[in-house]
From Swiss-Prot:
Residues 179-211 have a biased composition (Polar residues). Belongs to the MCM10 family. The keyword S-adenosyl-L-methionine does not apply. GO terms for biological process: DNA damage response; DNA replication initiation. This is Protein MCM10 homolog. Self-associates. Each zinc finger-like domain binds a zinc ion and is involved in both ssDNA and dsDNA binding, as is the OB-fold domain. The N-terminal domain mediates homodimerization. One of its GO terms (molecular function) is double-stranded DNA binding. Transmembrane segments: none annotated. Residues 98-116 have a biased composition (Basic and acidic residues). Residues 217-367 are annotated as: OB-fold domain. Residues 33-47, 55-65 have a biased composition (Acidic residues). It comes from Xenopus tropicalis (Western clawed frog).
Length: 845
């Protein structure tokens, strides 16, 4: 009974929440109907206002919203059925007390089943919403409009569906908590509130534009280039089709061409549009009449030196003053303003806020990554798509990138040299190493001080004699005398004497120390060890080698003379003792002496003896006694068996085997042969075997093995791609720097003009400074030129004032900061049909 009463109280509380949610939905509908309509940009040209009143387009947008709503929630038939159930529940609230408890339980069970269905539908729509790539962006208006459709999702609905019966006793407390909540919280917690059809109707066509044209930039995707502005946009606010419609019939003028177009053409007679990026926003200022205005600096990221100033007054300032820096905007029929005196800057203003179109954020706008000379980061704006460095730092960065390869190949160990650590590598130190005389001042004194400071100081061992102490020698003599007296008075024990009698290295060294015997080097009269330089050591070793070589040559000559005398006295003994295969010893013969002309046939015979030739061969050398004994034993065994050895025929070519030996070999082969019989494949022809092998090579199994690849090919490709990226990234950056330097044809700089000497240069002359001429610093433009012969020059005027120093012609052409690289030339380009032109015939007419 108590459980049924708790269910009844829960049902009544849910019905009350449903009524409160309906009242809130009616209030939200009334609030939404009071919203102002948002008019589109560039539409309508009457009385300075731009409104759209096409009913057909409104109906299309409404249909599009309903279709998108269907795709968001899927099948909404069940929700419509729920709408019909809600009025019935209102009627039942009046007679719910008269019904039996069983009927109430059945109704509660049905309601729980319906809630489960709603939960499943909401989960499916949530999954479809997260998985769909083109989710429409919800504006604040859409969030309010669709709030009635969301019911209760997530943990609130799950908690309400899974309430145990034991917790139903706390319903009075929950009812009190629900009464304390705000209407918005009640609407979020109520899961039986019916949807409001009127809330799905859009207020205006522009309010549904984000839903119809969703634009999202996924992470990691390349940003597309906008067609009209030529810039890459992040979070674009206008679709490409909408931009096509807006630009239809209007003239596009680039921001860099605006200055010439304003002067040469009448832009008031036609509709024209220009695009730019807000690169700088000046703090809002107050005019003389007390009204606030703001100024924007616009640029198209093509030429970062020229800017266009846009002034925002009145309503334009109130609506757009919060626009962020870096936003790409479009201007329709902007009004030109008079520039400031002394400048040629283009100034524009807009009289209507709808003439300013916010298109999105510029991806390529950034600041230079280099640092100034004072260490602060550079604040120059750059186009990141072209280069990451401004025109003032691109040359230094290019030199740094070009010299990286030499740095890698050098043998720099990372340790700073001592000279560099002391600061001896500055400009002053390098110039003043040898000294110079300039302007009546000599730098020899500074050079000597520099040499004394940079010279390495020799470390001297700090001893008592080196220190300036009075009576140092007397103190040292007294100490030596005390040590000698202590030695004499020292009593030696018996154990110490026994240890000293042992022939150990320690005992011997101690005896030498006590007896004061000089070292072995001093006994031989050699000089003590001293440190010498490397060059002196090399000279000393060279002298030692020359002396040793000279001694060796003298010994060889002396040995040769002795050997020749012995050979003359007893040549027979020398020839008999020398072995045939014995090589002469090193230094046995004098290399420069002439060899003896003794004939080899008469070797061993003295002068006057007869040489006899015999037909008998010389006697054989005596064999070893052990071999002779084994041979005799074998002969005796053969004779005991009655066998004899036949003498081998010396003229026979093949070795004859006995029949018994052949039989033994055949038996041995048969015993080692395999037991299996020969396969029939061995008897088949070789061509058939070859065909079978080819068939196996063409089989699927072999092709599968042949085409098998490793599982780590993906990782290998990623590693190769990473290596290629590391290799090509520096080259790509270097190429970007080169392209930027080639595109820079002029550059602003600080120059000085001397009115006395009538010149303009990058720095003043010393005479102008010393004589106090009338010169002043100002901004100038340096321009780069090249001649047809390849010579290059820089000028601060429109054209150089001098002829080419190489060819003498005055054919200057505009060029970039970097000299254009020329590749290898073909033979036709290097061919000179007329031969080489000589200097005296050049420029002759």
């Amino acid at each position: 009974m108590e459980a049924v009463d708790a269910d009844l109280e829960l049902l009544t509380s849910l019905l009350e929440e449903n009524e409160a949610a309906e009242s809130n939905s009616v209030e939200s509908h009334e609030a939404s109907s009071e919203l102002d309509e948002y008019d589109e940009l560039f539409d309508g040209d009457e009385d300075g206002s731009y409104h759209e009143s096409d009913n057909g387009t409104e109906e299309q947008t409404v249909d599009g919203v309903e279709e998108n709503f269907d795709t968001l929630f899927g099948d909404i038939d069940d929700i419509n059925e729920e709408e019909t159930v809600a009025p019935d529940t209102k009627k039942q609230s009046s007679v719910c007390q008269d019904k039996s408890k069983h009927e109430l339980e059945d109704e509660l069970r049905k309601m729980q089943e319906q809630m489960r269905k709603l939960q499943k539908q909401l989960q499916q729509t949530a999954l479809a919403k997260t998985s769909s790539p083109g989710n429409p962006m919800k504006s604040p208006d859409n969030k309010l409009l669709l709030s009635g459709k969301t019911f209760q999702s997530g943990p609130l609905l799950e908690r309400s569906l899974t309430v145990p019966k034991a917790n139903l006793q706390d319903t009075p407390k929950r009812k009190q908590n629900l009464q304390d909540k705000s209407p918005l919280q009640k609407q979020m917690t109520s899961f039986l509130s019916p949807p409001d059809k009127s809330s799905t109707r859009p207020v205006s066509s522009t309010a549904t534009q984000p839903v119809l044209n969703p634009v999202r930039s996924p992470v990691g995707q390349q940003y597309p280039v906008e067609k009209f502005s030529g810039l890459r946009l992040r979070k674009p606010r206008v679709s490409s089709s909408e931009m096509e419609r807006k630009m239809n019939g209007r003239k596009l003028i680039r921001l860099a061409q605006l200055q010439n177009k304003i002067v040469t053409e009448k832009l008031e007679d036609e509709d024209w549009v220009t695009f730019g990026v807000i690169v700088k926003k000046i703090t809002p200022q107050s005019s003389n009449n007390g009204k606030t205005f703001s100024i924007w600096r616009l640029n198209d990221l093509k030429n970062l030196d020229k800017y266009v100033s846009l002034f925002l007054f009145g309503d334009v300032h109130k609506e757009h003053w919060k626009t962020d820096q870096g936003t790409v905007i479009g201007l329709l029929n902007a009004n030109p303003m008079k520039p400031k005196e002394g400048t040629d800057e283009v100034c524009l203003s807009v009289d209507n806020p709808q003439k300013v179109l916010l298109m999105g954020d510029a991806v390529d706008l950034g600041t230079c990554k280099a640092r100034k000379k004072n260490g602060d980061p550079c604040t120059q704006m750059v186009n990141l798509n072209d280069c990451e460095y401004c025109q003032y730092h691109v040359q230094a960065q290019y030199k740094k990138v070009s010299s990286k390869r030499a740095d890698l190949q050098s043998s720099y160990s990372g340790h700073v040299p001592k000279k560099m650590a002391r600061g001896g590598n500055g400009l002053r130190e390098r110039l003043c190493q040898d000294g110079f005389h300039y302007g009546g001042v000599s730098s020899m004194a500074y050079a000597t001080t520099l040499a004394s400071t940079t010279a390495p100081k020799k470390t001297v061992q700090s001893t008592l004699s080196n220190m300036v102490v009075r009576g140092a020698e007397a103190i040292a003599l007294e100490a030596r005398q005390q040590i000698a007296a202590a030695r004499k008075n020292m009593v030696q024990s018996d154990e110490f004497k026994e240890l000293m009698t042992l022939p150990t290295p320690g005992a011997l060294n101690l005896k030498k120390h006590f007896s004061g015997v000089p070292t072995q080097a001093n006994e031989k009269g050699g000089q003590p060890f001293q440190s010498i330089s490397a060059s002196a050591l090399l000279k000393q070793q060279k002298q030692q080698m020359l002396g040793a070589r000279k001694k060796r040559a003298e010994e060889i000559q002396k040995r040769f003379l002795e050997s020749t005398e012995k050979s003359e006295k007893s040549s027979t003994l020398v020839s008999s003792e020398r072995s045939v295969f014995q090589s002469p010893k090193q230094g046995a013969e004098f290399p420069n002496a002439q060899k003896m002309a003794t004939p080899k046939l008469g070797r061993g015979f003295a002068e006057g003896e007869d040489v006899l030739f015999f037909d008998i061969s010389p006697p054989a050398a005596k064999s070893n006694t052990s071999a002779q004994a084994t041979k005799l034993a074998a002969i005796q065994k053969l004779q005991a068996k009655g066998q004899t050895l036949t003498k081998a025929d010396p003229n026979s070519i093949k070795r004859k085997r006995s029949s018994s030996a052949e039989e033994l070999v055949a038996q041995r082969v048969a015993s080692h042969a395999p037991a299996s019989t020969k396969s029939p494949d061995e008897n088949e022809p070789a061509m058939k075997k070859h065909r079978e092998q080819l068939a196996y090579l063409e089989s699927k199994e072999f092709q599968k093995i042949l085409n098998a690849k490793s599982k780590h090919t993906g990782i290998l490709k990623e590693a190769e791609a990473e290596i290629q990226e590391r290799y090509f990234d520096p080259l790509v950056k270097k190429e970007q720097l080169e392209e930027k330097m080639r595109s820079i044809r002029e550059q602003e700089c600080r120059v000085v003009t001397c009115k006395t000497c009538k010149y303009t240069h990058f720095k003043p002359k010393e005479t102008c400074v010393s004589e106090n001429h009338d010169f002043h610093w100002h901004n100038g433009v340096k321009r780069f030129f090249k001649c047809a012969c390849g010579n290059r020059t820089i000028s601060l005027d429109r054209l150089p004032k001098k002829h080419c120093s190489t060819c003498g012609l005055f054919k200057w052409e505009r060029d970039g900061m970097l000299k254009e690289k020329t590749g290898p030339k073909i033979a036709g380009e290097t061919l000179l049909p007329r031969g080489e032109e000589h200097g005296k015939f050049l420029n002759s007419h």
